[in-house]
Curated annotation (Swiss-Prot):
Pathway: Cofactor biosynthesis; pyridoxine 5'-phosphate biosynthesis; pyridoxine 5'-phosphate from D-erythrose 4-phosphate: step 1/5
Enzyme class: oxidoreductase
UniProt: NAD(+) binding residues: 11-12, 327
Organism placement in taxonomy: Bacteria, Pseudomonadati, Pseudomonadota, Gammaproteobacteria, Vibrionales
Binding site for substrate: 163-165, 209, 222-223, 245
CDD domains per UniProt: GAPDH_C_E4PDH
Protein name: D-erythrose-4-phosphate dehydrogenase
Length: 346
C-alpha cells in the first residue's frame, strides 16, 4: 500500500483524492493526510459537491482534524470509513510526513515546483514527491504517463507530472512521429477558464486576465512548447503554441497541426490513433468520430481523446487534428498512475 499525502486541496488535489476511489486505486493507494489552509467544513463540502464533476459517490464527513470517506452511502451510516488527517501548514518543513510515514507527497499547490521544494518535503520525512505542474528544469524527471514513465528510476525522488496539456498532446505527438515522422508543428490550446481569472473585471498583472472570464475568449501565455521539448529534446525549436481561455468551467480542446515526412491520407492518420488507443496507449488515448461537444468529455479519465471526424490532411504532409481532454479529471488520474509507477521503480 502506497501511503500518500496531498499538499494543496484545490481543483487538482480534490480530484486526485476522488480519483483514488472512483478508479479503484484505493486498494493500492492510501491517502493519509491533506494539507490545506482552508477550513475543514469547506474542504469536505467541495469534495462532496463539485460543479464540474457532480456529487462524489462516497459520503464525506469531517471534524476539525480529519476528513472521513465513508464506505457506505447512508447519511446515518455507522459503517467503515477511511480517516484522512487535515493539516493547515504553510511551511513545508513543518509538515509531519515522518510521523505519518508518508511514502509520496502529491504536491498540488501549484506554488512549489523546484528541486529545493521537493527536498524540503523529503527532509520533513516523505520518501518522494510528485508535482502537479511542469515545475523547474532541475527536477529528477518529468513524466507523461504512457510516453516515458518507464524512464523512472529508484533515485528519481522529485518528479513532475507535467501539465494537463502536455499529458493531452504529447502522446499524440509520439504516435504521429513514430508512424510518419514529424518535422514541426503548431498547437492552439482552447482551455476552460481557471481560477487565476476574474469573475468581473479586476486587477491582474496580465492585462488580458483583468477581464471577466465569462464574457470573452482570452489569450494567455503558454509554455507548452517547452513542455514538449522537455519530453522530446529532438523537437527543440520545432513546435510553437498559443493558448486561449474560453467561458466554460472544464474540458479543453487542442488544435494540433504538424508537418510530417510521409505522404498520408486522413484514414492513415486516424487508423494510427485507433491502433494506439487499443494497444500501447490503451486507457491513455481514446478515439471517437461521434458528433460530440466539450461537455461530453467531462469526467473522462483519458489523457487525450482524438475526434477523428475533425482530422484534416493538406497536400499529403500537413496534418490537423482536434484533441479533447478533461483538464482536471484526466490529469488527476495520471497523477495516480505516475505515483504507482514511482513506487514500482523502487
Amino acid at each position: 500500500m502506497l501511503k500518500v499525502a496531498i499538499n494543496g486541496f484545490g481543483r487538482i488535489g480534490r480530484n486526485v483524492l476522488r480519483a483514488v476511489y472512483e478508479s479503484g486505486k484505493h486498494q493500492q493507494i492510501k491517502v493519509v493526510a491533506v494539507n490545506e489552509l482552508a477550513q475543514p467544513e469547506a474542504m469536505a463540502h467541495l469534495l462532496q459537491y463539485d460543479t464540474s464533476h457532480g456529487r462524489f459517490g462516497k459520503r464525506i464527513s469531517h471534524d476539525q482534524e480529519h476528513l472521513y470517506v465513508h464506505h457506505d452511502a447512508c447519511p446515518q451510516g455507522k459503517g467503515e470509513f477511511d480517516s484522512i488527517r487535515i493539516l493547515h501548514l504553510s511551511e513545508i518543513n513543518l509538515l509531519p510526513w515522518r510521523d505519518l510515514e508518508v511514502d509520496l507527497v502529491l504536491d498540488c499547490t501549484g506554488v512549489f515546483g523546484c528541486q529545493a521544494d521537493g527536498l524540503e518535503h523529503i527532509k520533513a520525512g516523505a520518501k518522494k514527491v510528485l508535482f502537479s505542474h511542469p515545475g523547474a528544469s532541475d527536477l529528477d524527471n518529468t513524466i507523461i504517463y504512457g510516453v516515458n514513465h518507464e524512464t523512472l528510476k529508484a533515485e528519481h525522488n522529485v518528479v513532475s507530472n507535467g501539465s494537463c496539456t502536455t499529458n493531452c498532446i504529447v502522446p499524440i505527438i509520439k504516435v504521429l512521429d513514430e508512424a510518419f515522422g514529424i518535422e514541426s508543428g503548431t498547437i492552439t490550446t482552447i482551455h476552460s477558464s481557471m481560477n487565476d481569472q476574474q469573475v468581473i473585471d479586476a486587477y491582474h498583472s496580465d492585462l488580458r486576465r483583468t477581464r471577466a472570464a465569462s464574457q470573452s475568449i482570452i489569450p494567455v501565455d503558454t509554455k507548452l512548447h517547452k513542455g514538449i521539448e522537455r519530453i522530446f529534446p529532438k523537437f527543440s525549436n520545432k513546435f510553437e503554441a498559443i493558448s486561449v481561455r474560453v467561458p466554460t468551467v472544464n474540458v479543453t480542446a487542442m488544435d494540433l497541426s504538424v508537418t510530417i515526412n510521409t505522404n498520408v491520407k486522413v484514414n492513415d492518420v486516424n487508423q494510427t490513433i485507433v491502433n494506439a488507443s487499443q494497444c500501447t496507449l490503451r486507457g491513455i488515448v481514446d478515439y471517437t468520430e461521434a458528433p460530440l461537444v466539450s461537455i461530453d468529455f467531462n469526467h473522462d479519465p483519458h489523457s487525450a481523446i482524438v475526434d477523428g471526424s475533425q482530422t484534416r490532411v493538406s497536400n499529403g504532409h500537413l496534418v490537423k487534428m482536434l484533441v479533447w481532454c478533461d483538464n482536471e479529471w484526466g490529469f488527476a488520474n495520471r497523477m495516480l498512475d505516475t505515483a504507482l509507477a514511482m513506487q514500482a521503480a523502487q
